[in-house]
From Swiss-Prot:
Disulfide bonds join C31-C82, C35-C58, C44-C63, C48-C65. SMART domains: Knot1 (SM00505). One of its GO terms (molecular function) is toxin activity. This is Toxin CsE8. Belongs to the long (4 C-C) scorpion toxin superfamily. Sodium channel inhibitor family. Beta subfamily. Residues 1-19 form the signal peptide. It holds the Pfam family Toxin_3. CDD domains: neurotoxins_LC_scorpion (cd23106). Expressed by the venom gland. One of its GO terms (cellular component) is extracellular region.
Length: 85
């Protein structure tokens, strides 16, 4: 019984360690996906899920995602400063 509990705990931990989180970013401009209302946000949730994430919220006027695939690019992008030179 104890070993089953340990295996289950390890699998849960493995899922949280290997998933990414961060602000969604437009790769062509380096700008974050904008949103208006902080907290739960259907637009951000939809955009995050379309990128393979588990969920999304609006935080600091930008879409913040949880559970993104490892290869998903998040803000900031090196060399892309969102309109700044």
């Amino acid at each position: 019984m104890n070993s089953l509990l340990m295996i289950t705990a390890c699998l849960v931990l493995f899922g949280t360690v290997w998933s990414e989180k961060g602000y969604l970013v437009h790769e062509d401009t380096g700008c974050r996906y904008k949103c208006t209302f902080s907290g739960e946000n259907s637009y951000c949730d939809k955009e995050c899920k379309s990128q393979g994430g588990d969920s999304g919220i609006c935080q600091s006027k930008a879409c913040y995602c949880q559970g993104l695939p490892e290869d998903t690019k998040t803000w900031p992008l090196i060399g892309k400063l969102c309109g700044r030179k």
